[in-house]
Amino acid sequence: MKADIHPDYRQVVFVDSTTGAKFLSGSTAKAQGEVEYEGQTYPMVRVEVTSDSHPFYTGKQKINQADGAVDKFNKKYGLN
């Protein structure tokens, strides 16, 4: 392997911008600062959506079921 071509892999804390939740994980993402997590200082990366704020994981998901072509035809011509 060539030397000095691989990104620096390290422990990073991802911070959810919406909820403020913190997740420690390994990453090569560029840090946007530092944050203290469980008594240690780690590089920090802010993210907009995590499992703590995504509607699928929080149970606040809205399901929009689109009508198919047959349903639209039946509604248009009153064939229900």
Curated annotation (Swiss-Prot):
User: Keywords, A to Z?
Assistant: Ribonucleoprotein, Ribosomal protein
InterPro entries noted in UniProt: Ribosomal_bL28/bL31-like_sf (IPR034704), Ribosomal_bL31 (IPR002150), Ribosomal_bL31_B (IPR027493), Ribosomal_bL31_sf (IPR042105)
Which GO terms fall under biological process for this protein?
Answer: translation
Its quaternary organisation is: Part of the 50S ribosomal subunit.
What is this protein called in UniProt?
Answer: Large ribosomal subunit protein bL31B
Spell out the molecular function terms from Gene Ontology: structural constituent of ribosome
Gene3D superfamilies registered for this protein in UniProt: Ribosomal protein L31 (4.10.830.30)
Per its UniProt entry, which superkingdom is the organism in?
Answer: Bacteria
Q: Which organism is it from?
A: Oenococcus oeni (strain ATCC BAA-331 / PSU-1)
Its Gene Ontology cellular component terms are: ribonucleoprotein complex; ribosome
What would be the name of the gene that encodes this protein?
A: rpmE2
Q: Which PANTHER family match?
A: 50S RIBOSOMAL PROTEIN L31, CHLOROPLASTIC, LARGE RIBOSOMAL SUBUNIT PROTEIN BL31C
Listed Pfam families: Ribosomal_L31 (PF01197)
What does the similarity note say?
Belongs to the bacterial ribosomal protein bL31 family. Type B subfamily.
